[in-house]
Amino acid sequence: MASETETFAFQAEINQLLSLIINTFYSNKEIFLRELISNSSDALDKIRFESLTDKSKLDAQPELFIHIVPDKASNTLSIIDSGIGMTKSDLVNNLGTIARSGTKEFMEALAAGADVSMIGQFGVGFYSAYLVAERVVVTTKHNDDEQYVWESQAGGSFTVTRDTSGEQLGRGTKITLYLKDDQLEYLEERRLKDLIKKHSEFISYPISLWTEKTTEKEISDDEDEEEKKDAEEGKVEDVDEEKEEKEKKKKKIKEVSHEWSLVNKQKPIWMRKPEEITKEEYAAFYKSLTNDWEEHLAVKHFSVEGQLEFKAVLFVPKRAPFDLFDTRKKLNNIKLYVRRVFIMDNCEELIPEWLSFVKGIVDSEDLPLNISREMLQQNKILKVIRKNLVKKCVELFFEIAENKEDYNKFYEAFSKNLKLGIHEDSTNRNKIAELLRYHSTKSGDELTSLKDYVTRMKEGQNDIYYITGESKKAVENSPFLEKLKKKGYEVLYMVDAIDEYAVGQLKEFEGKKLVSATKEGLKLDESEDEKKRKEELKEKFEGLCKVIKEVLGDKVEKVVVSDRVVDSPCCLVTGEYGWTANMERIMKAQALRDSSMAGYMSSKKTMEINPENAIMEELRKRADADKNDKSVKDLVLLLFETALLTSGFSLDDPNTFGSRIHRMLKLGLSIDEDETAEADTDMPPLEDDAGESKMEEVD
């Protein structure tokens, strides 16, 4: 008896949606497979849930699976699952006559420029089949109904027929896509495997692909010879047996066989208990996730339960990628799943920029499937997930720090990220600060933490001292450290460009203020005798300070007697809230710097002179004798320019500085000035350049 076929009209909105999908060009059509596999996974979830209370529900088909069958002969691709299936009314209602609330919203989102890949979020993922197919046939069998076939070419209507003659499914759904002529790539085994791995690798049911295997078999012509024997019986030749064996023709025949190939071999590792997973399994998962050829350095596997549920596995690689801070590169190190379905791998809201090197996956039970980027920015669930991820990452770094060798590797690769964290993450700043490591005046070749520094602080020392500069070599003999070293205070060497930014935010650690050795406001404990001596020297050198200020003009803001320099004649310090010499150097190196900021941030310098230094004492005597003495002015300018260099600044006019040095050399070697008068005619008069700043403005 022929089955009756019923024809139904698509509901108006669904018709509109189909028209949009078919007639608009979308570049990422490949998402259809993700959507259909996701639907299969949902159907399997439903039957698995029903079977918990009634095992007989699985009798018709005990195995839970998803099968993908490409058929090049008919240009069809079938997705088969042993899920819950659909009754006739499910078919009619779900696939065409009742518009889901999401249909209209999805079309509005598409019109507003949203991506077609969001389709599943609106509950209409099935229709993505029409991105690649001109005709779709759905065969389905529910435990409570007979087998039915739904069919449509999306021309405004669909048909539903009771299936009596077709292959019986037992239970489940088979979707057959009759592919468009320009979409036949989806019949290729490699393409399908890549797609399943990309989008559906961690679906919790086995996804098997029907693959074709062609093997070549090489056989001798024995079989053919038997057939020809009768015809050739009369032609007998005396041929050497061995020769005949050699010359016997070989024949290649192709054998074609088909078999199921399991694609999602990687079981969702995050669904298992951490204690059950071996180091090798984590390593294999890490490599499959990141395509890294090395194993990871550390892993954190955890789940959060309660009002919000998600599971995550986070990895720290052994080395930093070459493009770690490439701002043009999309961050795609954390893959976001929702209930085992891959959603996206470049979700910027999931993890802050300073943790961009951490790789892994997050699987949420609460986020809606296929959540859009716009919704992500507002999503409260995601904000909670992000907060937890940051917390767990910091915990992981502390775990790495327990092994000194591992932490050294980690710190070498990712210290800049931690410092960026100090700069950007006010919530976790104090915690991240404990992870910082620096060389210091007392640490030798080892790195020291701020915590260790605090334990070594001298009695009466209230602040943590640091110096910033270009390199350890550049700062370890800096004049700024002389007094601090003499008093036995430890000074941290901050020689990474990003240290300047980090320390700008990290004002203190464990209640101890971080104080720069190169800025104003360095106050060191002094005895009464020291204070008295300082006042006397201040008075004694007051005249020289005025002379130096007159000579240097607006190159310096003021000239004072120093209590930080012990051996050097002088140094140049910057304002407490302005840029250090090192920061000025960094800002000059910025090709696209903001020049408006430089004017007020590159603060005026204060020249601090050392009254105990023999050069300064001699200069004082000469200035007291005659403040217009030409040699005094020349010496002051030379000392200033030398102090610029030793204090970490750059010279605006190195040629003039060189000429001054040469003049001093001549004096030292008693070379008569008249002999070289001609050569000196180009030298600028010392008095004229006194009022002009020779420092390059940082613009």
Curated annotation (Swiss-Prot):
Residues 215-250, 672-699 are annotated as: Disordered. One of its GO terms (biological process) is protein folding. InterPro entries: HATPase_C_sf (IPR036890), Heat_shock_protein_90_CS (IPR019805), HSP90_C (IPR037196), Hsp90_fam (IPR001404), Hsp90_N (IPR020575), Ribosomal_Su5_D2-typ_SF (IPR020568). One of its GO terms (cellular component) is protein-containing complex. CDD domains: HATPase_Hsp90-like (cd16927). ATP binds at N39, D81, F126, R373. It is found in: Cytoplasm. It comes from the Eukaryota. A motif (TPR repeat-binding) lies at residues 695-699. Keywords: ATP-binding, Chaperone, Cytoplasm, Nucleotide-binding, Stress response. Homodimer. Belongs to the heat shock protein 90 family. This is Heat shock protein 81-1. It comes from Oryza sativa subsp. japonica.
